[in-house]
């Protein structure tokens, strides 16, 4: 398990989603929740984002 923290610009780049879409999907339980890094800083665990991406790929390949 990786505890590497990804910041918002990298999460946007990896997912292809906008900031507002990421936060909307988080609110709807459709994207991993961010973790507080203190102050106004947040990040996402790399494993959580990787698992979400892998699931999206798997779902898109189902008939």
Model-derived features: positions:
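Polyanion-binding surface elements
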Residues: 1-21, 51-56
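Residues at secondary-structure transition points
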Residues: 2, 6, 39-40, 44
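C-terminal structural segments of small proteins and small subunits
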Residues: 46-62
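Intrinsically disordered, low-complexity and often Lys/Arg-enriched segments
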Residues: 1-2, 61-63
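Major-groove DNA-recognition helix of helix-turn-helix-type DNA-binding domains
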Residues: 14-43, 57
């Amino acid at each position: 398990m990786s505890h590497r923290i990804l910041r918002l610009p990298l999460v946007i780049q990896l997912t292809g989603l906008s900031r507002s879409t990421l936060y909307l999907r988080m609110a709807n339980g459709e994207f991993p929740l961010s973790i507080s890094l203190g102050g106004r800083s947040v990040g996402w665990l790399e494993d959580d984002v990787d698992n979400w991406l892998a699931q999206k790929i798997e779902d898109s390949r189902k008939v």
